[in-house]
Amino acid sequence: MQRRNQKVIEFAPAWSISEETRKKILDSAKRLARRVGYTNAGTMEFLVDEEEHPYFIEMNPRIQVEHTVTEMVTGIDIVICQILIAEGYPLNSPTIHIYSQNEI
């Protein structure tokens, strides 16, 4: 929900889409990140129409102001992870311990 083009309420995970659509979005985001060689924290945004067709709209290769919502949902400190990844730690290292996207 937005007010004056600023997000004031965020629902996460999105309650209005099916698991099938959620999986399509996740798979698309992972494919894009692999394709461009992106290996750090970022946000990919999708729109979904009434028939649940997802459309990619943008990628923000940075931590957004709403990152605290993601941290609450996932239990992952994104800022620390971003620094560790920049230092060369892989996601599945014991320091970061994100072994698969399914764990998030």
Description of each model-found segment:
Residues 1-104:
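ATP-dependent carboxylate activation and anion-phosphoryl transfer catalytic cores
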